[in-house]
């Protein structure tokens, strides 16, 4: 990729999608800090420039190509092998991770699916109370019994879950007024049969492999193609080379029976398969939860 091509890509992304600028520093000296506008992303291919970007607290993506094999490019968690890796979502993720902003996963007509922040603690505790007899509908584990314990759990979850695994449980928000409606997202799924699972009151459903084809929109670039040394940790291989996840949701009572789940689950599944690279997505539902079973079978 030469500088002209890089600048064309930058202009396209900046004008159509972003409120920040992408700066390409390919095989050249690092410019003066004053040359960078606010909200910059840096793409470079030299170790020394990666270190300078870090020194100035700028989010940086490494670019590996045939002419820089001697560079380690280990100074950043972000790496691409070609310009196809520069998808809008990926660039937005780099920006949000660096500046510790909640990442918007997807939107629908009525809902925004976005990473949680500590501002949602009161609503998450309300959801916990409404589901005190239904642990699968809770965000916090059952051993979080005090406000302080719940607050600490949420802080640690936000700090570690999204950045390390690349996915997690997200908040569902109203598009018009940002009202918190509930939670939905992914958790690791262990496909292990034990006496407990055989006697469980829950049923497991494998989400249709073709469900994502029902969702319009351009296919996103799989992040595993442009992740760095964390790739093997983010994308472990399960038995039979499957990368599985469990999807779940829980909606506050006042927003139930309004089609929220049926609206947010298809685009969320599409995101899981097309961007996160899940080969199998399952959900666990109580046997007497007829509405959720019917939704899972759609």
Regions from the PLM with identified roles:
Residues 37-39, 167, 278:
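Short, high-confidence coil segments that cap the C-terminus of an alpha-helix
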Residues 249, 257-271, 290-297:
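Conserved acetyl-CoA-binding loop-helix of GNAT-fold acetyltransferases
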Residues 64-68, 191, 284:
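Conserved catalytic-core motifs of GNAT/GCN5-like acyltransferases
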Residues 29-32, 268, 272:
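Short hydrophobic clusters on alpha-helical segments that form packing/core surfaces
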Residues 3, 17, 81-254, 270-271, ...:
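GNAT-family acyltransferases
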Residues 1-106:
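Asp-based, Mg2+/Mn2+-dependent phosphohydrolase catalytic module
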Residues 275-284:
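Conserved GNAT acetyl-CoA-binding A-motif
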